[in-house]
């Protein structure tokens, strides 16, 4: 008899296949006394080396199949493995207490995990606890000679079922064989869900009990569009899901026909659909999906993929490659956004209780520590500007004083290059990322001095709602459609237009099919998203009338008190 479970729709698509249970191995061990502590330390070093090699391979594969943005999660894991303080404490534990490496590892990592988890009001520390837990599990497996699940070995069509999928699990999924995945826990903004959308694998998370209900080999029918899973579907249900899968495949084929088309609404208004990228390699996805621009080039990956500060020439070559690759189409380059969850092994930053609200991004660039890095980046960008349509964007701007200071450095380096006889473009737009509520509220003042705005909704929502989207205990407050968020976005768009400037968006909300009608109605000029969302969004835009969507946005802003009311109104206007 079939049974239906409801979960969170995390990645679109429909699939019917047998279940493959991703079961975690038994990593239990006995604490033992040892005489040869040097031998135990050597065992630990071997396990660390194997873990590093594995994670580096997984990271490289993730960068290739998912892009640098999704691969960066593994940088935090690699930094845990090379943390001299933690590794030193484990070895000291072996030496002082004459215990086996397994026991020393568990004692030290449990101490760190407990310490970070105790800071339950600090999302950054919660994430560090999760990183250490994942890495400790991998090291322990090597110490015990136990093989961790390897999803990359799956060689038949299956639907992966797990309590949760770590980023390393998800990055190893081969979409040739893995038709979908379903988990007990997780949310739409979890790392595994974001990776699933990049891989274009249907996914449902947060079912609470899928692993209790399913056995290996059970047939599952998954609809990642609405969040339904049927266990052991009847022939009729199976046929229905297979028909839905075909309909979805046909729909995707229709979207593919729009690859070379401009994005035009039902009433003839052109809207720019751009892509977010992390490296020049990501341009392949932009072209494959018909991107009209690069709306966000995350330059921090140049720094994160290097063992030392990238030189001016290294940066120039990367920026040149992207600008030339886009053949005159706009490229918005975000200056270095280091700090928060993005650390560099060769840049020592002060320890902070909450790095997300601390010393990061433009705050580093404008400091004595970051001045040289920032000026080098400005020179590389200015030199590359002659190869395409460059736009420069400063992240984490809270005050006009910060923008003016950054713009002054840009002008200073530009003049130096001109004096050196180096050709630079005189048509470079300079704008800011709106991700701090203070900047959104003062958008009318900023608009007089910037050339454009790009709304970074991921952080804007977190900072406005005081809720970390990766923290499941408060994730219900991560509300892109909360009227307060919509009002801030509308304020930014109106402020830009009042000064004859353009406003874009580069957060996940820009590619959200529920948000697009609202944002179009508010007058957003540019939507920048994961490249895989572009064709679907272009198809939606073709069906939307800007006058009708403006009415929708106006009503949402004036009449709605809650996120649920906004949802209902959007459904009324788009059904």
Swiss-Prot record:
Cofactor: Mg(2+)
Pfam families: PEP-utilisers_N, PEP-utilizers, PEP-utilizers_C
Subcellular location: Cytoplasm
Active site: 191 (tele-phosphohistidine intermediate), 506 (proton donor)
One of the GO BP terms on file: phosphoenolpyruvate-dependent sugar phosphotransferase system
One Gene Ontology CC term in the entry: cytoplasm
Role this protein plays: General (non sugar-specific) component of the phosphoenolpyruvate-dependent sugar phosphotransferase system (sugar PTS). This major carbohydrate active-transport system catalyzes the phosphorylation of incoming sugar substrates concomitantly with their translocation across the cell membrane. Enzyme I transfers the phosphoryl group from phosphoenolpyruvate (PEP) to the phosphoryl carrier protein (HPr).
Subunit structure: Homodimer.
Protein name: Phosphoenolpyruvate-protein phosphotransferase
Organism: Enterococcus faecalis (strain ATCC 700802 / V583)
């Amino acid at each position: 008899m079939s049974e239906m479970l409801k979960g969170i729709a995390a990645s679109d698509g429909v699939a019917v296949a047998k279940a493959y249970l991703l079961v975690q191995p038994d990593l239990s061990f006995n604490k033992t006394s040892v005489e040869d502590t040097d031998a135990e330390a050597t065992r630990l070093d071997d396990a660390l080396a194997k873990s590093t090699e594995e994670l580096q391979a997984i990271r490289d594969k993730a960068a290739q199949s998912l892009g640098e943005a999704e691969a960066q999660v593994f940088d935090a894991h690699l930094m845990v493995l090379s943390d001299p303080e933690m590794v030193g404490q484990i070895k000291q534990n072996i030496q002082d207490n004459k215990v086996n490496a397994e026991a020393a590892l568990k004692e030290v990592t449990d101490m760190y995990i407990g310490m970070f988890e105790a800071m339950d009001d600090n999302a950054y520390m919660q994430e560090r606890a999760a990183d250490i837990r994942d890495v400790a599990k991998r090291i322990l497996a090597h110490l015990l000679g136990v093989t961790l699940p390897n999803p990359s070995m799956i060689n038949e069509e299956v639907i992966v079922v797990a309590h949760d999928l770590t980023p390393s699990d998800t990055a190893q999924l081969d979409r040739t064989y893995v038709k979908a995945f379903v988990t007990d826990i997780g949310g739409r903004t979890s790392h595994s869900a974001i990776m699933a959308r990049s891989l274009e694998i249907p996914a449902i998370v947060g079912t609470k009990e899928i692993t209790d209900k399913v056995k290996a080999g059970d047939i599952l029918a998954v609809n990642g569009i609405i969040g339904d899973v049927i266990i052991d579907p009847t022939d009729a249900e199976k046929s229905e899901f297979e028909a839905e899968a075909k309909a979805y495949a046909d729909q995707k084929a229709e979207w593919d026909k729009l690859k070379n088309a401009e994005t035009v609404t039902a009433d003839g208004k052109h809207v720019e659909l751009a892509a977010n990228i992390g490296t020049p390699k990501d341009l392949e996805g932009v072209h494959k999906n018909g991107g009209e621009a690069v709306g966000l080039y995350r330059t921090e990956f140049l720094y994160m993929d290097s063992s030392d500060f990238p030189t001016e020439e290294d940066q120039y070559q990367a920026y040149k490659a992207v600008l030339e690759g886009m053949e005159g189409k706009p490229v918005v380059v975000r200056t270095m956004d280091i700090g928060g969850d993005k650390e560099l092994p060769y840049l020592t930053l002060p320890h902070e209780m909450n790095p997300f609200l601390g010393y990061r991004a433009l705050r580093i660039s404008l400091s004595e520590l970051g001045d040289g890095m920032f000026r080098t980046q400005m020179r590389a960008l200015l030199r590359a500007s002659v190869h395409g349509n460059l736009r420069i964007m400063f992240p984490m701007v809270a005050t006009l004083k910060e923008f003016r200071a950054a713009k002054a450095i840009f002008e200073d380096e530009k003049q130096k290059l001109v004096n050196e006889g180096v050709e630079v473009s005189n048509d470079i737009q300079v704008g800011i990322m709106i991700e701090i509520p203070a900047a959104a509220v003062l958008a009318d003042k900023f608009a007089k001095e910037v050339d454009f705005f790009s709304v970074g909704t991921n952080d804007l929502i977190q900072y406005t709602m005081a809720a970390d989207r990766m923290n499941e205990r408060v994730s219900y407050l991560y509300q892109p459609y909360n009227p307060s968020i919509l009002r801030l976005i509308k304020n930014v768009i109106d402020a830009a237009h009042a000064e004859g400037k353009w406003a874009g968006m580069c957060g996940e909300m820009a590619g959200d099919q529920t948000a697009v009608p609202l944002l179009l109605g508010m007058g957003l000029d540019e939507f920048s998203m994961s490249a895989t969302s572009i064709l679907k969004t272009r198809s939606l835009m073709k069906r939307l009338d800007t006058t009708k969507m403006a009415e929708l946005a106006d009503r949402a802003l004036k009449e709605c008190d809650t996120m649920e009311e906004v949802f209902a109104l959007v459904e009324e206007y788009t059904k």
